[in-house]
Amino acid sequence: MTKYVFVTGGVVSSLGKGIAAASLAAILESRGLKVTLLKLDPYINVDPGTMSPFQHGEVFVTEDGAETDLDLGHYERFISTKMRKANNFTTGQIYESVIRKERRGDYLGKTVQVIPHITNEIQAFIERGAASATCGEPDVAIVEIGGTVGDIESLPFLEAARQMSLRLGRNSACFVHLTLVPFIATAGELKTKPTQHSVQKLREIGISPHVLLCRADRPIPDDESKKISLFSNVPEDAVISVWDVDSIYKIPQMLHDQGLDRLICEELRLDPQPADLRMWAALVEKLQNPKHEVTIGMVGKYVDLTESYKSLIEALRHASIHTSTKVNIEYINSEELETNGTASLAHLDAVLVPGGFGRRGTEGKIAAVRYAREAKVPYLGICLGMQLAVIEFARDVVGLKQANSTEFDPNTPERVVALITEWYDREGKVEKRTEDSDLGGTMRLGSQRCPIKPGTLAEAIYGKDVNERHRHRYEVNNRFVPQLEAGGLVISARTPSEDLPEMMELPSTMHPWFVGVQFHPEFTSTPRDGHPLFKSFVQAALACQQTRAGAKA
Protein backbone atom coordinates (compact mmCIF):
# COMPACT_ATOMS: atom_id res chain seq x y z
CA MET A 1 0.00 0.00 0.00
CA THR A 2 1.28 3.47 -0.90
CA LYS A 3 2.17 5.80 1.99
CA TYR A 4 1.85 9.58 1.58
CA VAL A 5 4.01 12.53 2.58
CA PHE A 6 2.31 15.92 2.28
CA VAL A 7 4.65 18.89 1.91
CA THR A 8 3.21 22.30 2.79
CA GLY A 9 4.71 25.77 2.92
CA GLY A 10 4.31 28.74 5.22
CA VAL A 11 5.15 32.44 5.74
CA VAL A 12 6.04 33.21 2.10
CA SER A 13 6.06 31.45 -1.26
CA SER A 14 9.15 30.44 -3.27
CA LEU A 15 10.90 28.87 -0.30
CA GLY A 16 11.75 25.76 -2.30
CA LYS A 17 9.05 23.21 -1.47
CA GLY A 18 9.69 21.57 -4.84
CA ILE A 19 13.42 21.17 -4.18
CA ALA A 20 12.74 19.92 -0.65
CA ALA A 21 10.18 17.38 -1.87
CA ALA A 22 12.45 16.22 -4.70
CA SER A 23 15.43 15.93 -2.35
CA LEU A 24 13.45 13.81 0.11
CA ALA A 25 12.33 11.64 -2.82
CA ALA A 26 15.96 11.24 -3.93
CA ILE A 27 17.00 10.06 -0.46
CA LEU A 28 14.12 7.61 -0.19
CA GLU A 29 14.86 6.27 -3.67
CA SER A 30 18.50 5.77 -2.66
CA ARG A 31 17.16 3.63 0.19
CA GLY A 32 15.54 1.27 -2.31
CA LEU A 33 11.99 2.61 -2.12
CA LYS A 34 9.81 3.27 -5.15
CA VAL A 35 8.85 6.94 -5.02
CA THR A 36 6.65 9.29 -7.01
CA LEU A 37 5.76 12.96 -6.53
CA LEU A 38 2.66 15.04 -7.17
CA LYS A 39 2.22 18.81 -7.34
CA LEU A 40 -1.12 20.40 -6.43
CA ASP A 41 -1.50 23.96 -7.72
CA PRO A 42 -4.23 26.11 -6.16
CA TYR A 43 -4.76 28.47 -9.09
CA ILE A 44 -7.94 28.30 -11.18
CA ASN A 45 -6.16 27.98 -14.54
CA VAL A 46 -6.66 24.49 -15.96
CA ASP A 47 -2.91 24.26 -16.55
CA PRO A 48 -0.02 26.75 -16.81
CA GLY A 49 0.16 26.44 -20.60
CA THR A 50 -1.34 29.86 -21.33
CA MET A 51 0.17 31.69 -18.34
CA SER A 52 2.83 34.35 -18.82
CA PRO A 53 6.38 33.25 -17.95
CA PHE A 54 6.57 36.40 -15.81
CA GLN A 55 3.60 35.09 -13.79
CA HIS A 56 4.47 31.42 -13.58
CA GLY A 57 7.99 30.79 -14.77
CA GLU A 58 8.74 27.79 -16.96
CA VAL A 59 6.08 25.40 -18.22
CA PHE A 60 7.50 21.88 -17.93
CA VAL A 61 6.30 19.37 -20.55
CA THR A 62 5.98 15.73 -19.56
CA GLU A 63 6.57 12.75 -21.82
CA ASP A 64 2.82 12.30 -22.33
CA GLY A 65 2.38 15.92 -23.39
CA ALA A 66 1.07 17.63 -20.26
CA GLU A 67 1.92 21.29 -19.65
CA THR A 68 2.80 21.35 -15.96
CA ASP A 69 4.45 23.25 -13.14
CA LEU A 70 8.23 23.68 -13.27
CA ASP A 71 8.55 21.67 -10.04
CA LEU A 72 7.87 18.51 -12.07
CA GLY A 73 11.16 19.25 -13.80
CA HIS A 74 12.90 19.15 -10.43
CA TYR A 75 11.15 15.88 -9.65
CA GLU A 76 12.40 14.23 -12.85
CA ARG A 77 15.92 15.55 -12.31
CA PHE A 78 16.13 14.19 -8.76
CA ILE A 79 14.54 10.74 -9.14
CA SER A 80 14.29 8.11 -11.87
CA THR A 81 10.46 8.04 -11.99
CA LYS A 82 9.08 9.95 -14.97
CA MET A 83 6.22 12.38 -14.41
CA ARG A 84 2.90 12.26 -16.25
CA LYS A 85 -0.15 14.46 -16.62
CA ALA A 86 -1.61 12.87 -13.48
CA ASN A 87 1.32 14.13 -11.38
CA ASN A 88 0.16 17.76 -11.53
CA PHE A 89 -3.32 19.16 -11.17
CA THR A 90 -4.90 22.51 -10.40
CA THR A 91 -7.99 23.96 -8.77
CA GLY A 92 -9.23 24.59 -12.30
CA GLN A 93 -9.03 20.89 -13.19
CA ILE A 94 -10.76 19.88 -9.95
CA TYR A 95 -13.66 22.27 -10.44
CA GLU A 96 -13.89 21.38 -14.12
CA SER A 97 -14.18 17.70 -13.23
CA VAL A 98 -16.76 18.28 -10.48
CA ILE A 99 -18.90 20.56 -12.67
CA ARG A 100 -18.78 18.00 -15.49
CA LYS A 101 -20.01 15.31 -13.06
CA GLU A 102 -22.76 17.61 -11.79
CA ARG A 103 -23.95 18.25 -15.36
CA ARG A 104 -24.04 14.50 -16.01
CA GLY A 105 -26.13 13.99 -12.90
CA ASP A 106 -23.51 11.96 -11.04
CA TYR A 107 -24.39 13.65 -7.74
CA LEU A 108 -28.06 12.65 -8.00
CA GLY A 109 -29.45 16.12 -7.44
CA LYS A 110 -27.44 16.90 -4.31
CA THR A 111 -26.13 20.37 -3.54
CA VAL A 112 -22.52 20.33 -4.76
CA GLN A 113 -20.20 21.84 -2.14
CA VAL A 114 -16.51 22.31 -1.38
CA ILE A 115 -16.90 19.69 1.36
CA PRO A 116 -17.36 16.87 0.49
CA HIS A 117 -17.42 17.09 -3.30
CA ILE A 118 -14.34 19.21 -4.05
CA THR A 119 -12.25 17.64 -1.28
CA ASN A 120 -13.27 14.13 -2.35
CA GLU A 121 -12.30 14.94 -5.93
CA ILE A 122 -8.89 16.20 -4.78
CA GLN A 123 -8.32 12.95 -2.87
CA ALA A 124 -9.33 10.93 -5.93
CA PHE A 125 -6.91 12.90 -8.10
CA ILE A 126 -4.09 12.32 -5.57
CA GLU A 127 -4.68 8.57 -5.41
CA ARG A 128 -5.06 8.34 -9.19
CA GLY A 129 -1.80 10.23 -9.66
CA ALA A 130 0.05 7.94 -7.27
CA ALA A 131 -1.42 4.83 -8.89
CA SER A 132 -0.29 5.92 -12.36
CA ALA A 133 3.38 6.20 -11.35
CA THR A 134 5.78 4.93 -14.01
CA CYS A 135 7.73 3.02 -11.32
CA GLY A 136 4.76 0.74 -10.63
CA GLU A 137 2.90 0.95 -7.32
CA PRO A 138 5.02 3.39 -5.29
CA ASP A 139 6.00 2.78 -1.69
CA VAL A 140 5.82 6.51 -1.04
CA ALA A 141 3.99 9.31 -2.84
CA ILE A 142 5.20 12.79 -1.90
CA VAL A 143 2.48 15.39 -2.45
CA GLU A 144 3.55 19.02 -2.66
CA ILE A 145 0.69 21.43 -1.95
CA GLY A 146 1.34 24.72 -3.71
CA GLY A 147 0.76 28.12 -2.19
CA THR A 148 1.17 29.23 1.41
CA VAL A 149 -0.73 28.11 4.50
CA GLY A 150 -3.26 30.85 5.21
CA ASP A 151 -4.07 31.51 1.56
CA ILE A 152 -7.75 31.03 0.81
CA GLU A 153 -6.90 29.21 -2.46
CA SER A 154 -5.00 26.43 -0.65
CA LEU A 155 -7.68 25.62 1.94
CA PRO A 156 -9.55 22.90 -0.04
CA PHE A 157 -6.25 21.10 -0.74
CA LEU A 158 -5.17 21.22 2.91
CA GLU A 159 -8.59 20.04 4.04
CA ALA A 160 -8.45 17.18 1.52
CA ALA A 161 -4.99 16.20 2.81
CA ARG A 162 -6.28 16.26 6.41
CA GLN A 163 -9.26 14.08 5.51
CA MET A 164 -7.09 11.69 3.52
CA SER A 165 -4.63 11.28 6.38
CA LEU A 166 -7.51 10.49 8.75
CA ARG A 167 -9.11 8.06 6.30
CA LEU A 168 -5.88 6.16 5.60
CA GLY A 169 -5.19 5.69 9.31
CA ARG A 170 -2.10 5.79 11.48
CA ASN A 171 1.34 5.56 9.93
CA SER A 172 -0.03 5.91 6.40
CA ALA A 173 0.54 9.64 5.93
CA CYS A 174 2.68 12.37 7.42
CA PHE A 175 3.11 16.12 7.04
CA VAL A 176 6.29 18.08 6.36
CA HIS A 177 5.99 21.85 6.70
CA LEU A 178 8.53 24.17 5.08
CA THR A 179 8.76 27.59 6.67
CA LEU A 180 10.94 30.69 6.81
CA VAL A 181 13.20 31.78 9.66
CA PRO A 182 14.32 35.25 8.55
CA PHE A 183 17.52 36.93 9.67
CA ILE A 184 16.95 40.54 10.72
CA ALA A 185 20.20 42.32 9.94
CA THR A 186 19.54 45.35 12.15
CA ALA A 187 18.88 43.10 15.15
CA GLY A 188 21.59 40.63 14.17
CA GLU A 189 19.45 37.58 14.88
CA LEU A 190 17.13 34.98 13.40
CA LYS A 191 13.43 35.39 14.15
CA THR A 192 11.30 32.31 14.83
CA LYS A 193 7.94 34.05 15.31
CA PRO A 194 6.83 33.71 11.63
CA THR A 195 7.42 29.96 11.87
CA GLN A 196 5.48 29.71 15.13
CA HIS A 197 2.52 31.54 13.60
CA SER A 198 2.64 29.46 10.41
CA VAL A 199 2.50 26.19 12.35
CA GLN A 200 -0.29 27.61 14.51
CA LYS A 201 -2.25 28.42 11.34
CA LEU A 202 -1.73 24.87 10.08
CA ARG A 203 -2.89 23.39 13.38
CA GLU A 204 -6.03 25.55 13.29
CA ILE A 205 -7.20 23.59 10.24
CA GLY A 206 -6.45 20.27 11.90
CA ILE A 207 -2.96 19.46 10.62
CA SER A 208 -0.06 18.97 13.00
CA PRO A 209 3.22 18.71 11.09
CA HIS A 210 5.51 15.80 11.90
CA VAL A 211 8.61 17.58 10.57
CA LEU A 212 9.54 21.23 10.15
CA LEU A 213 12.00 22.29 7.45
CA CYS A 214 13.21 25.73 8.50
CA ARG A 215 14.59 27.82 5.64
CA ALA A 216 17.19 30.44 6.48
CA ASP A 217 20.22 32.06 4.93
CA ARG A 218 22.41 30.27 7.50
CA PRO A 219 22.29 27.16 9.73
CA ILE A 220 19.83 27.60 12.60
CA PRO A 221 21.48 27.42 16.06
CA ASP A 222 20.34 24.75 18.53
CA ASP A 223 18.76 27.25 20.92
CA GLU A 224 16.54 28.60 18.12
CA SER A 225 15.59 25.05 17.12
CA LYS A 226 14.58 24.34 20.72
CA LYS A 227 12.40 27.45 20.76
CA ILE A 228 10.73 26.43 17.49
CA SER A 229 10.17 22.92 18.87
CA LEU A 230 8.61 24.24 22.08
CA PHE A 231 6.17 26.62 20.43
CA SER A 232 5.23 24.44 17.45
CA ASN A 233 4.85 21.14 19.35
CA VAL A 234 7.27 19.39 16.99
CA PRO A 235 10.06 17.23 18.49
CA GLU A 236 13.43 18.97 18.49
CA ASP A 237 15.07 16.36 16.24
CA ALA A 238 12.28 16.99 13.71
CA VAL A 239 13.12 20.70 13.44
CA ILE A 240 15.49 20.59 10.48
CA SER A 241 17.61 23.49 9.32
CA VAL A 242 17.71 24.13 5.56
CA TRP A 243 20.11 26.91 4.73
CA ASP A 244 21.16 28.54 1.47
CA VAL A 245 23.71 26.59 -0.57
CA ASP A 246 25.40 27.24 -3.92
CA SER A 247 23.96 24.08 -5.51
CA ILE A 248 20.56 22.45 -5.11
CA TYR A 249 22.28 19.08 -5.52
CA LYS A 250 23.71 19.48 -2.00
CA ILE A 251 20.25 19.45 -0.45
CA PRO A 252 19.73 15.64 -0.33
CA GLN A 253 22.90 15.20 1.73
CA MET A 254 21.98 18.14 3.99
CA LEU A 255 18.55 16.67 4.76
CA HIS A 256 19.90 13.15 5.23
CA ASP A 257 22.60 14.35 7.63
CA GLN A 258 19.85 15.78 9.85
CA GLY A 259 17.80 12.59 9.72
CA LEU A 260 14.82 13.63 7.60
CA ASP A 261 14.52 10.27 5.85
CA ARG A 262 14.83 8.45 9.19
CA LEU A 263 11.98 10.51 10.66
CA ILE A 264 9.75 9.85 7.64
CA CYS A 265 10.47 6.12 7.58
CA GLU A 266 9.78 5.83 11.32
CA GLU A 267 6.48 7.70 11.04
CA LEU A 268 5.36 5.61 8.04
CA ARG A 269 6.64 2.33 9.53
CA LEU A 270 9.03 1.71 6.65
CA ASP A 271 12.27 -0.22 7.11
CA PRO A 272 14.29 0.20 3.91
CA GLN A 273 18.03 -0.22 3.32
CA PRO A 274 20.45 2.55 4.38
CA ALA A 275 20.70 5.60 2.13
CA ASP A 276 23.43 5.64 -0.51
CA LEU A 277 24.10 9.22 -1.61
CA ARG A 278 27.52 8.65 -3.18
CA MET A 279 26.20 9.65 -6.61
CA TRP A 280 25.08 13.03 -5.29
CA ALA A 281 28.41 13.58 -3.56
CA ALA A 282 30.24 12.77 -6.81
CA LEU A 283 28.06 15.20 -8.79
CA VAL A 284 28.73 18.02 -6.33
CA GLU A 285 32.44 17.23 -6.40
CA LYS A 286 32.54 17.51 -10.20
CA LEU A 287 30.43 20.66 -10.18
CA GLN A 288 32.75 22.39 -7.73
CA ASN A 289 36.03 21.33 -9.31
CA PRO A 290 35.85 22.08 -13.05
CA LYS A 291 38.93 21.95 -15.26
CA HIS A 292 37.70 24.50 -17.79
CA GLU A 293 35.40 27.52 -17.99
CA VAL A 294 33.22 28.93 -20.79
CA THR A 295 30.71 31.75 -21.15
CA ILE A 296 27.46 31.09 -23.01
CA GLY A 297 25.06 33.88 -23.93
CA MET A 298 21.37 33.08 -23.54
CA VAL A 299 19.44 35.52 -25.72
CA GLY A 300 15.77 35.90 -24.80
CA LYS A 301 13.06 38.28 -23.70
CA TYR A 302 12.30 36.69 -20.32
CA VAL A 303 15.87 37.06 -19.01
CA ASP A 304 14.74 39.25 -16.09
CA LEU A 305 13.02 36.16 -14.69
CA THR A 306 15.41 33.23 -15.07
CA GLU A 307 12.73 30.86 -13.67
CA SER A 308 11.36 31.01 -17.24
CA TYR A 309 14.37 28.97 -18.37
CA LYS A 310 14.78 26.74 -15.30
CA SER A 311 15.20 23.39 -17.11
CA LEU A 312 17.54 24.96 -19.66
CA ILE A 313 19.76 26.41 -16.94
CA GLU A 314 19.85 23.05 -15.19
CA ALA A 315 20.64 21.23 -18.46
CA LEU A 316 23.68 23.48 -18.95
CA ARG A 317 24.67 22.79 -15.35
CA HIS A 318 24.42 19.05 -16.00
CA ALA A 319 26.61 19.46 -19.08
CA SER A 320 29.03 21.38 -16.88
CA ILE A 321 29.26 18.39 -14.54
CA HIS A 322 29.87 15.88 -17.33
CA THR A 323 32.39 17.95 -19.29
CA SER A 324 34.35 19.26 -16.27
CA THR A 325 33.62 22.76 -17.54
CA LYS A 326 32.21 25.62 -15.51
CA VAL A 327 29.44 27.21 -17.59
CA ASN A 328 28.84 30.89 -16.97
CA ILE A 329 25.46 31.90 -18.38
CA GLU A 330 25.15 35.50 -19.51
CA TYR A 331 21.53 36.57 -19.92
CA ILE A 332 21.07 38.95 -22.84
CA ASN A 333 17.85 40.85 -23.49
CA SER A 334 17.07 40.43 -27.18
CA GLU A 335 15.33 43.82 -27.34
CA GLU A 336 18.60 45.51 -26.36
CA LEU A 337 20.31 43.84 -29.34
CA GLU A 338 17.72 45.46 -31.60
CA THR A 339 18.73 48.86 -30.25
CA ASN A 340 22.45 48.50 -29.57
CA GLY A 341 23.66 45.86 -32.05
CA THR A 342 25.60 42.66 -31.35
CA ALA A 343 28.91 44.07 -30.08
CA SER A 344 27.99 42.79 -26.59
CA LEU A 345 28.22 39.20 -27.92
CA ALA A 346 31.85 39.39 -29.01
CA HIS A 347 33.32 37.84 -25.84
CA LEU A 348 30.96 34.84 -25.77
CA ASP A 349 32.13 31.29 -26.39
CA ALA A 350 28.67 30.22 -27.63
CA VAL A 351 25.18 31.60 -28.24
CA LEU A 352 21.89 29.98 -27.26
CA VAL A 353 18.43 31.19 -28.29
CA PRO A 354 15.76 29.35 -26.27
CA GLY A 355 12.07 28.82 -26.93
CA GLY A 356 9.53 31.60 -26.69
CA PHE A 357 6.36 33.08 -28.13
CA GLY A 358 5.35 36.36 -29.72
CA ARG A 359 6.91 38.97 -31.95
CA ARG A 360 8.58 41.15 -29.32
CA GLY A 361 12.37 40.83 -29.34
CA THR A 362 12.55 38.47 -32.33
CA GLU A 363 14.66 40.75 -34.54
CA GLY A 364 17.23 40.97 -31.74
CA LYS A 365 17.34 37.18 -31.58
CA ILE A 366 17.76 37.01 -35.37
CA ALA A 367 20.67 39.46 -35.05
CA ALA A 368 22.24 37.10 -32.48
CA VAL A 369 21.78 34.17 -34.89
CA ARG A 370 23.45 36.15 -37.68
CA TYR A 371 26.36 37.05 -35.41
CA ALA A 372 26.90 33.42 -34.37
CA ARG A 373 26.74 32.17 -37.96
CA GLU A 374 29.11 34.80 -39.38
CA ALA A 375 31.56 34.77 -36.45
CA LYS A 376 31.65 30.93 -36.44
CA VAL A 377 30.60 30.89 -32.77
CA PRO A 378 28.74 27.72 -31.66
CA TYR A 379 24.99 28.23 -31.86
CA LEU A 380 22.12 26.24 -30.36
CA GLY A 381 18.56 27.24 -31.23
CA ILE A 382 15.73 25.57 -29.33
CA CYS A 383 12.15 25.63 -30.68
CA LEU A 384 11.74 29.31 -31.60
CA GLY A 385 15.54 29.47 -31.68
CA MET A 386 15.56 26.95 -34.55
CA GLN A 387 12.79 28.78 -36.41
CA LEU A 388 14.68 32.07 -36.16
CA ALA A 389 17.87 30.38 -37.37
CA VAL A 390 15.97 29.19 -40.46
CA ILE A 391 14.53 32.69 -41.01
CA GLU A 392 17.97 34.29 -40.71
CA PHE A 393 19.46 31.76 -43.14
CA ALA A 394 16.60 32.32 -45.59
CA ARG A 395 17.07 36.09 -45.48
CA ASP A 396 20.84 36.44 -45.39
CA VAL A 397 22.11 33.37 -47.26
CA VAL A 398 19.30 32.27 -49.60
CA GLY A 399 18.16 35.83 -50.33
CA LEU A 400 14.51 35.59 -49.28
CA LYS A 401 14.53 39.10 -47.81
CA GLN A 402 10.92 38.97 -46.59
CA ALA A 403 11.27 35.56 -44.96
CA ASN A 404 9.40 35.43 -41.68
CA SER A 405 7.06 33.43 -39.49
CA THR A 406 3.31 33.92 -39.74
CA GLU A 407 3.39 34.18 -35.95
CA PHE A 408 5.13 37.56 -36.31
CA ASP A 409 3.83 38.67 -39.72
CA PRO A 410 0.66 36.89 -40.89
CA ASN A 411 0.88 38.61 -44.29
CA THR A 412 4.50 37.80 -45.14
CA PRO A 413 4.81 36.48 -48.73
CA GLU A 414 7.70 34.19 -47.74
CA ARG A 415 6.25 32.04 -44.98
CA VAL A 416 9.37 30.14 -44.04
CA VAL A 417 7.77 29.27 -40.69
CA ALA A 418 4.00 28.76 -40.52
CA LEU A 419 1.18 27.30 -38.45
CA ILE A 420 0.62 23.64 -39.16
CA THR A 421 -3.11 22.90 -39.20
CA GLU A 422 -3.12 19.11 -38.99
CA TRP A 423 -0.82 16.58 -37.37
CA TYR A 424 -0.79 13.19 -35.63
CA ASP A 425 -0.65 12.98 -31.84
CA ARG A 426 1.32 10.39 -29.86
CA GLU A 427 -1.48 7.82 -30.32
CA GLY A 428 -1.70 8.29 -34.08
CA LYS A 429 -4.91 10.33 -33.99
CA VAL A 430 -5.30 13.33 -36.27
CA GLU A 431 -5.32 16.66 -34.41
CA LYS A 432 -6.40 19.91 -36.06
CA ARG A 433 -6.06 23.59 -35.23
CA THR A 434 -6.58 26.98 -36.83
CA GLU A 435 -5.55 30.55 -36.10
CA ASP A 436 -8.78 30.85 -34.09
CA SER A 437 -8.25 27.75 -31.95
CA ASP A 438 -7.97 28.14 -28.17
CA LEU A 439 -4.41 28.73 -27.04
CA GLY A 440 -4.67 26.00 -24.40
CA GLY A 441 -4.10 22.46 -25.61
CA THR A 442 -3.58 23.27 -29.30
CA MET A 443 0.15 22.76 -29.52
CA ARG A 444 2.27 19.84 -30.57
CA LEU A 445 3.04 18.44 -27.13
CA GLY A 446 4.96 15.53 -25.64
CA SER A 447 7.56 13.07 -26.87
CA GLN A 448 8.05 12.02 -30.47
CA ARG A 449 10.71 9.74 -31.93
CA CYS A 450 12.29 10.77 -35.25
CA PRO A 451 14.98 9.18 -37.45
CA ILE A 452 18.19 11.15 -37.98
CA LYS A 453 19.91 11.69 -41.31
CA PRO A 454 23.14 9.65 -41.51
CA GLY A 455 26.46 11.48 -41.62
CA THR A 456 25.20 14.58 -39.82
CA LEU A 457 26.32 16.30 -36.64
CA ALA A 458 22.93 15.31 -35.22
CA GLU A 459 23.80 11.64 -35.74
CA ALA A 460 27.17 12.14 -34.05
CA ILE A 461 25.33 13.59 -31.04
CA TYR A 462 22.21 11.41 -30.79
CA GLY A 463 22.79 8.29 -32.86
CA LYS A 464 20.23 6.87 -35.32
CA ASP A 465 17.15 8.55 -33.88
CA VAL A 466 16.02 11.21 -31.42
CA ASN A 467 13.18 11.06 -28.90
CA GLU A 468 12.43 14.45 -27.34
CA ARG A 469 9.51 16.52 -26.04
CA HIS A 470 7.72 19.26 -27.98
CA ARG A 471 5.77 22.40 -27.17
CA HIS A 472 5.04 24.55 -30.21
CA ARG A 473 2.42 25.60 -32.76
CA TYR A 474 4.57 26.73 -35.66
CA GLU A 475 6.78 24.63 -37.94
CA VAL A 476 9.39 25.18 -40.63
CA ASN A 477 7.46 25.30 -43.92
CA ASN A 478 8.43 22.37 -46.16
CA ARG A 479 7.67 24.45 -49.26
CA PHE A 480 10.87 26.45 -48.68
CA VAL A 481 13.11 23.56 -47.64
CA PRO A 482 14.49 22.89 -51.17
CA GLN A 483 15.71 26.51 -51.39
CA LEU A 484 17.21 26.34 -47.91
CA GLU A 485 18.99 23.07 -48.70
CA ALA A 486 20.29 24.52 -51.97
CA GLY A 487 21.86 27.29 -49.88
CA GLY A 488 23.66 24.70 -47.73
CA LEU A 489 21.33 24.22 -44.77
CA VAL A 490 20.89 20.59 -43.68
CA ILE A 491 17.62 19.17 -42.32
CA SER A 492 19.06 16.43 -40.14
CA ALA A 493 15.86 14.99 -38.62
CA ARG A 494 12.20 14.88 -39.67
CA THR A 495 8.98 13.60 -38.13
CA PRO A 496 8.21 10.14 -39.55
CA SER A 497 4.50 10.82 -40.22
CA GLU A 498 4.29 14.44 -41.46
CA ASP A 499 7.91 14.78 -42.67
CA LEU A 500 8.28 18.04 -40.73
CA PRO A 501 11.80 19.37 -39.98
CA GLU A 502 12.84 18.52 -36.41
CA MET A 503 16.54 19.38 -36.52
CA MET A 504 18.63 21.64 -38.73
CA GLU A 505 22.35 22.26 -38.89
CA LEU A 506 25.02 23.84 -41.01
CA PRO A 507 27.67 21.56 -42.53
CA SER A 508 31.20 21.73 -41.11
CA THR A 509 32.33 23.49 -44.29
CA MET A 510 30.09 26.43 -43.33
CA HIS A 511 30.26 26.41 -39.53
CA PRO A 512 31.99 24.31 -36.82
CA TRP A 513 28.84 23.83 -34.67
CA PHE A 514 25.45 25.31 -35.62
CA VAL A 515 22.36 23.34 -34.58
CA GLY A 516 18.65 24.09 -34.29
CA VAL A 517 16.07 21.76 -32.76
CA GLN A 518 12.28 22.10 -32.87
CA PHE A 519 11.90 20.14 -29.62
CA HIS A 520 12.94 20.94 -26.03
CA PRO A 521 15.93 18.77 -25.08
CA GLU A 522 16.26 20.50 -21.70
CA PHE A 523 13.23 18.59 -20.40
CA THR A 524 15.05 15.24 -20.54
CA SER A 525 18.40 16.28 -19.09
CA THR A 526 19.31 14.91 -15.64
CA PRO A 527 22.31 15.46 -13.36
CA ARG A 528 22.95 11.71 -13.37
CA ASP A 529 23.58 11.44 -17.12
CA GLY A 530 23.60 14.95 -18.55
CA HIS A 531 22.29 15.32 -22.09
CA PRO A 532 24.23 14.56 -25.30
CA LEU A 533 23.17 17.76 -27.08
CA PHE A 534 24.15 20.08 -24.24
CA LYS A 535 27.39 18.21 -23.60
CA SER A 536 28.29 18.59 -27.28
CA PHE A 537 27.32 22.28 -27.17
CA VAL A 538 29.54 22.98 -24.14
CA GLN A 539 32.42 21.06 -25.74
CA ALA A 540 31.97 23.16 -28.89
CA ALA A 541 32.06 26.34 -26.78
CA LEU A 542 35.30 25.16 -25.20
CA ALA A 543 36.78 24.37 -28.63
CA CYS A 544 35.79 27.86 -29.84
CA GLN A 545 37.48 29.42 -26.83
CA GLN A 546 40.66 27.42 -27.41
CA THR A 547 40.69 28.29 -31.14
CA ARG A 548 40.44 31.97 -30.30
CA ALA A 549 43.20 31.70 -27.73
CA GLY A 550 45.41 29.96 -30.30
CA ALA A 551 44.70 32.67 -32.87
CA LYS A 552 45.67 35.40 -30.39
CA ALA A 553 48.87 33.58 -29.51
From Swiss-Prot:
A GO-annotated cellular component:
cytosol
Q: Which residues form a coiled coil?
A: none
Give the region (Amidoligase domain) as residue ranges. 1-270
GO terms for MF: ATP binding; CTP synthase activity; glutaminase activity; identical protein binding; metal ion binding
Q: Which residues form the signal peptide?
A: none
Q: Where is the Glutamine amidotransferase type-1 domain?
A: 295-547
Q: What InterPro entries does this protein's entry cite?
A: Class_I_gatase-like, CTP_synthase, CTP_synthase_N, GATASE, GATase1_CTP_Synthase, P-loop_NTPase
Notes on activation and inhibition: Allosterically activated by GTP, when glutamine is the substrate; GTP has no effect on the reaction when ammonia is the substrate. The allosteric effector GTP functions by stabilizing the protein conformation that binds the tetrahedral intermediate(s) formed during glutamine hydrolysis. Inhibited by the product CTP, via allosteric rather than competitive inhibition.
Chain residues that bind Mg(2+):
71, 144
Question: Where along the chain is L-glutamine bound?
Answer: 356, 384-387, 407, 473
- The Enzyme Commission number assigned here is 6.3.4.2
Regarding protein family, the annotation reads: Belongs to the CTP synthase family.
Matches recorded under PANTHER family: CTP SYNTHASE (PTHR11550), CTP SYNTHASE-RELATED (PTHR11550:SF0)
The UniProt function text for this chain reads: Catalyzes the ATP-dependent amination of UTP to CTP with either L-glutamine or ammonia as the source of nitrogen. Regulates intracellular CTP levels through interactions with the four ribonucleotide triphosphates.
Q: What else is known?
A: CTPSs have evolved a hybrid strategy for distinguishing between UTP and CTP. The overlapping regions of the product feedback inhibitory and substrate sites recognize a common feature in both compounds, the triphosphate moiety. To differentiate isosteric substrate and product pyrimidine rings, an additional pocket far from the expected kinase/ligase catalytic site, specifically recognizes the cytosine and ribose portions of the product inhibitor.
Protein name stated in the entry: CTP synthase
Native organism = Burkholderia mallei (strain NCTC 10229)
